[in-house]
Amino acid sequence: MKKLFIAVLLGTFCLMSAGIQASYAGEIDLLLQKLVDKGVLTGAEAQQVKTETQEQVKKEIAQGKFSSLPAWVMNTKLKGDLRLRFQNLHEQNTNDISKNTTIGRVRMRLGLDSKVNDKFKVGVGIATNADGDPRSTNVSFGAKDGGDSSKMGIRLDYAYAKYDPTPWLTLVGGKMLLPDVLWEPTDLIWDTDITPEGGVIGFNKTLNPKTSVFMKAGALVLVADTSTVSGSMAYLVQPGINYAINDNLSLKGALTYEYFQTKGSIASSFSKGNNTKIGTITSTAYGSYAYNYSLLNPALELTIKQPFAAVGLNVESLKFFGEYVNNLAVSEKNTGYSLGLQFGNEKMEKWGDWQVKYIYAMLGNNSVFDMLPDSDRYSGQTGIRSHEGIISFGLAKNVSLGLDVYRSWAINGNHGLTASASSAAKPETLIQFDLNMKF
């Protein structure tokens, strides 16, 4: 009978000890001491129960039966990154006057992902940001906010809810991460810092071992509807396919249609002023958009694993990619495209990882909504052509160095029909040295 009592006691203590609260350990010691004082257990038996309880709990935690942390903590992931940047911008204006700007910058992003239950997940992120610019999470040292080591701004970067009713269906709503909204092989149309607001439904289905298909469809809020301002929306649909040609060769493609309801909407201060506007345009009044933007955007990416294995070179992957865009709502200066390649390691994770990337991009003035393109490529303007080269090298686990160089020009029209030697092209060169750390 006494052995049965000890066995029951041992099981009870194991359950009590499975949580994270350290107070349970003290409570068990007190209870065992009272049982010894009352003669229910001997001192040796009490010590045996305590030792076996500790060993059993350790074993069950290792097997995953119990967690040393509460469930909500175990289901939550904290992630972030810090980037230090030295940047030089060389500009040549129309009067042949050159200007050099050299600054230091920092970017900090911190995100939290939490699994609410088997179907729901939430994500929240904050980031450095100077003035609410949707295309940048950088802040500059000695910035216009005050300089002299003044405090820098932190803003809500994203906040979304994600629902997965089935393995092939996902619904996302809120201020979302861009990859949840659409797939893009380059930042020709969308700067990767943008976190769109609205809702998206996504489908992803594997058809066979070589083929999977996906589709995203969404409605995005551009300007809120108020009593004084008519709201504007954007809508998109993107069907796509992944196809494994063989073990080392794969293809990904998509055809995106995006409609931006912008005609008559007042441009914000973040507009670069390249799209055709109507009304009074000054340094504080940005006019209204003359057109809607109805974008047809095919995109393709070809990936080759170990492309140079035949000649003894260990290069993890080689990618070729490209995009084309046509604004169907207008008839001139309405196209753009990007072409590029990337080779080296897929990800920068450890010492010795390396990556080289090149992109050529061209955008006509009215080819895309001018609030969207990469903010580093000619300051995010349309009506441009640009070369970009990137070299990255891993210094340690989750630490890397990067060199990113842009050489860009303004263009007269949408096919780059301007002499690059002309000062009217207003060429600029942007050089960025980055130290990247992930945690």
Predicted segments, located by residue:
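N-terminal secretory signal peptides that target proteins for export/translocation
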Residues: 1-3
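Transmembrane beta-barrel architecture of outer-membrane proteins
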Residues: 77, 81-83, 103-107, 151-158, ...
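Outer-membrane beta-barrel architecture
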Residues: 68, 109-111, 159-162, 200-202, ...
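N-terminal periplasmic/intermembrane-space "pro-region" immediately following the signal or transit peptide
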Residues: 5-95, 439
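Signature for the C-terminal beta-barrel architecture of outer-membrane proteins
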Residues: 165-171, 179-347, 353, 360, ...
